[in-house]
Amino acid sequence: MKLNISFPATGCQKLIEVEDERKLRTFYEKRMATEVAADPLGDEWKGYVVRISGGNDKQGFPMKQGVLTHGRVRLLLSKGHSCYRPRRTGERKRKSVRGCIVDANLSVLNLVIVRKGEKDIPGLTDNTVPRRLGPKRASRIRKLFNLSKEDDVRQYVVRKPLAKEGKKPRTKAPKIQRLVTPRVLQHKRRRIALKKQRTQKNKEEASEYAKLLAKRSKEAKEKRQEQIAKRRRLSSLRASTSKSESSQK
């Protein structure tokens, strides 16, 4: 089995192949996200603690968190699920995934170093890979440089050097996202004002409609009462004429 080990503190990653089954037994029957002591891997791993972050079986099917089995299952996956990327909006697909419990049928097991041990691992903890890009979001820049809300974030942006032969060296800065500027606040005020205007307009229209409805219902009621009174007058007139005719006979 191969072990794909990463160390986030240095940004390094190393793939090692372990032939001895006894060294791997410490990982068997463990679930994803479990922290395991890496001492059985060798003397250089003494004191190291690693977290199981995933893996793939011999056919390439990935492990999925929350599927409590050793084997493979077919799940109906949609947007937001791990092990699946939808190609269309709202698309769902039944995919084969492996359970989150480690066993001997895996070809690669992904591990993340949680605690460093006594010795350095060559190519993993002795070297540091600098990040290619700095943070882009305003809140993350503040967090990186421990800035307050009053500080100007734009002065602390990590710039990327662009070196070209025969040209003056220059740097490139990313566009800061979620930066609160006077223009953003103005847009927010305008949105709130427009919303208030819409609410007021809807209220006025609703009250006008209610008045019109009341007026129409009142008119309809008066008209109905007039018709009833007219019918009564006609019926009484007919009754009186029939009485007079009968008396003459």
Swiss-Prot record:
Ribosomal protein S6 is the major substrate of protein kinases in eukaryote ribosomes. The phosphorylation is stimulated by growth factors, tumor promoting agents, and mitogens. It is dephosphorylated at growth arrest. Gene3D superfamilies: 1.20.5.2650. The keyword NADP does not apply. InterPro entries: Ribosomal_eS6, Ribosomal_eS6-like, Ribosomal_eS6_CS. Keywords: Cytoplasm, Nucleus, Phosphoprotein, Ribonucleoprotein, Ribosomal protein. GO terms for biological process: cytoplasmic translation; ribosomal small subunit biogenesis. GO terms for cellular component: cytoplasm; nucleolus; ribosome; small-subunit processome. The modification Phosphoserine is found at S235, S236, S240, S244, S247. It is found in: Cytoplasm; Nucleus, Nucleolus. Residues 161-181, 194-249 are annotated as: Disordered. Belongs to the eukaryotic ribosomal protein eS6 family. This is Small ribosomal subunit protein eS6. The lineage of its organism: Eukaryota, Metazoa, Chordata, Craniata, Vertebrata.
